[in-house]
């Protein structure tokens, strides 16, 4: 996972940033913290070691798309085939959500909570407030 992330940074993210473009990723280091540390119990020290070793550029801004767990699970089921994370129980997602909450408290200048219970258009409008 981290070798692919390092390659993605070097071949996609950094060239785009150097060209003056804005880069949006659907998952990155904060998702790794929420899912692997908060959700699965990986130690933060191990994750930090991986980030220090493989991640040459940390995000300037993270949007945390927060919605009630049951709503998120219903949306995933409505899309069809569930991936391995989407097959987890609600208790796992409560831990992940708590992880994102902890990140937003630890880095309030960078991690922004968006109310994802709203329509996609409303969520997009929330995100635009930070640009």
Q: What kind of feature is each model-predicted range?
A:
Residues 1-55:
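ATP-dependent small-molecule kinase phosphotransfer cores
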Residues 38-40, 59, 90, 97-98:
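Short capping/connector residues at structural and topological boundaries
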């Amino acid at each position: 996972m981290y070798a692919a992330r390092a390659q993605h940074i070097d071949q996609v993210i950094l060239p785009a940033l150097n060209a003056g473009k804005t880069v949006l990723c659907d998952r990155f280091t904060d998702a790794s913290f929420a899912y692997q540390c908060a959700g699965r119990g990986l130690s933060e020290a191990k994750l930090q070691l991986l980030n220090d070793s493989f991640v040459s550029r940390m995000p300037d801004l993270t949007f945390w798309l927060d919605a009630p767990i049951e709503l998120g699970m219903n949306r995933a089921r409505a899309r069809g085939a569930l991936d391995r994370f989407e097959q987890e129980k609600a208790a796992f997602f409560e831990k992940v959500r708590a992880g994102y909450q902890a990140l937003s408290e630890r880095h309030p200048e960078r991690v922004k909570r968006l109310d994802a219970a709203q329509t996609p258009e409303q969520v997009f409008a929330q995100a635009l407030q930070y640009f």
